[in-house]
């Protein structure tokens, strides 16, 4: 059992990794062909597909920041495979295709959330929000959640604010890329409800 499996078991959160069915809305471009989205725990066998999706989804971030060397675009298959040992990966599946993913790990009371990705054809339809909700459920005993995104990624920042995240500080990743770190704290009542 990995550290993350043990941490999640201690939080009694394994129930949230079962398949969750979510009805899709009808849209153009093939969206109507997908009647159900599954949110599942991703396995190491999904690493190749998750990495390909990551590189596709982060192209817009690279263009926005004028930097094609951002870590999501330079990550290797072996690097992402090694992350499965220390992080929980979720995937959003439509038909037989992974259309979204998110990963997280917990250290003490803080859950570090990272690499929220949704296929460009499926963005703006609530899949990112759903993945975020599921990862927060999975780490139900975390006291706080922390993540970061580019200061230029205004749509990401809006999403995280809607979900209760607040800006903490900013930090330069490179001459072209400035990151904003955000956090969400659970109040006592929310923690109590999630753990019942």
Predicted regions and their residues:
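Conserved GNAT acetyl-CoA-binding A-motif
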Residues: 132, 139-149
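Conserved beta-strand-loop-alpha-helix junction that forms the acyl-donor binding cleft
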Residues: 123, 146-157, 173-177
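Conserved beta-strand in the GNAT
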Residues: 91, 97-105, 112-117
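A short beta-loop-alpha structural element at the N-terminal edge
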Residues: 38-52
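Conserved acetyl-CoA pyrophosphate-binding loop and the N-cap/start of the following alpha-helix
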Residues: 122, 126-134
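Conserved active-site alpha-helix within GNAT-family acetyltransferase domains
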Residues: 129-130, 152-170
């Amino acid at each position: 059992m990995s550290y993350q499996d043990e941490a999640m078991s201690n939080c009694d959160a394994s129930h949230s990794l079962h398949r969750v069915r979510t009805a899709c809305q009808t849209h153009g471009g093939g969206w109507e062909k997908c009647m159900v989205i599954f949110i599942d725990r991703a396995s190491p066998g999904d690493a190749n597909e998750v990495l390909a999706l990551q590189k596709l989804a982060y192209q817009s971030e690279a263009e926005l920041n004028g930097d094609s060397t951002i870590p999501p675009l330079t990550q290797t298959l072996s690097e992402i495979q090694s992350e499965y040992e220390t992080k929980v990966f979720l995937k959003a599946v439509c038909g037989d295709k992974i259309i979204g993913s998110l990963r997280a790990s917990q250290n003490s009371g803080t859950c570090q959330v990272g690499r929220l990705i949704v296929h460009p054809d499926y963005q703006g339809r609530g899949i990112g929000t759903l993945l975020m909700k599921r990862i927060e459920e999975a780490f139900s005993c975390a006291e706080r959640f922390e993540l970061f995104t580019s200061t230029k990624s205004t749509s990401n920042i809006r999403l995280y604010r809607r979900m209760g995240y607040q800006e903490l500080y900013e930090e330069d990743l490179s001459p072209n890329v400035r990151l904003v770190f955000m956090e969400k704290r659970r109040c006592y009542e929310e923690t109590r409800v999630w753990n019942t």
